[in-house]
Amino acid sequence: MKSLPIALQLYSVRDELGADFEGTLKKVKEMGYDGVEFAGLCDKSFDEIKNICDNIGLSCVSVHISLDEVSANPDMIIDGYKSLGCKQITVPYLPEGVRPGEGGFDKTVAAMTAVGKKCKEKDMFFAYHNHDFEFVKVGDEYGLDVLYNTISSDLLICQLDTCWVNVGGVNPSEYIRKYAGRMYTVHLKDFVGQKTDNMYGLIGLKEDDGSGVKVEEFDFRPVGYGVQNFPEILKASVEAGAQWVVVEQDRPALGKTPLECAQMSVEYLKSLRVSDILKE
């Protein structure tokens, strides 16, 4: 089976990156990552970042940027990230009020369509990264399906976050296959614990669902150290035509630092390659 290159979403090491931008990227490369996905530039220029990444040997795969920000100056932002070698502009989140099924959704569709057209003109992908709230039904469909059925696949592709798909109650591998041919990247994220009624303030809290029984504490984990079936997720990603997998861990766990967690994730993924799960 095809071996997918591995990138790190730099939000995972945001504090380290802010303290030592170049040094942190060097460590990411030394761990064995092939590329990175940005979530801000740490006050660096595009030229500075390109020089640093080129010297280190890291590919710039994608960026997370708000819809409002990219809509305000699409040419500058798309051209800037394209100059780094990025192939994908990704909206990581939609605030309440503008999500599928809500009053401001038409505004979201118009803005995404406009940015998608700009990206298409510049030979870039425009993607949306889900959380769990898109798996609330809007009529007979999940909100995420409403989004992808409303905007055509040539203007908007998927960046499926496998943790949030699972938390939303859907099998990640099956959902990846559902959108085969509509993804450049897949987010690999692991976790333990259970969804609660007030999940989306969720992280690190034990919640009472009203039954008097405490549910297991939700927490993120390095890839391979939680509940996810990554061999199957990776197989589905390859079959669906993804070109990159992106590791993300919103906060560290198991008493490890963010960099240690990132290393645990990439070592686990490389162990799957060694065991032939991901080899040609």
Place the predicted regions along the sequence by residue.
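C-terminal/domain-terminus segments
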Residues: 242-271
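Conserved beta-strand positions in the central sheet of alpha/beta enzyme cores
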Residues: 37, 62, 90, 127, ...
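A short, acidic, amphipathic alpha-helical segment used as a generic capping/interface helix at domain edges
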Residues: 225-238
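Tryptophan-centric aromatic hotspots in well-structured domains and transmembrane helices
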Residues: 10-13, 33, 64, 128-129, ...
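Acidic/histidine-rich catalytic cores of soluble enzymes
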Residues: 121-227
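Active-site acidic/histidine proton-transfer and metal-coordination neighborhood
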Residues: 67-158, 178, 259
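N-terminal pre-domain/capping segments
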Residues: 1-88, 157, 235, 263-280
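Acidic-and-aromatic substrate-binding clefts and catalytic sites of carbohydrate-active enzymes
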Residues: 14-19, 35-48, 65-73, 96-100, ...
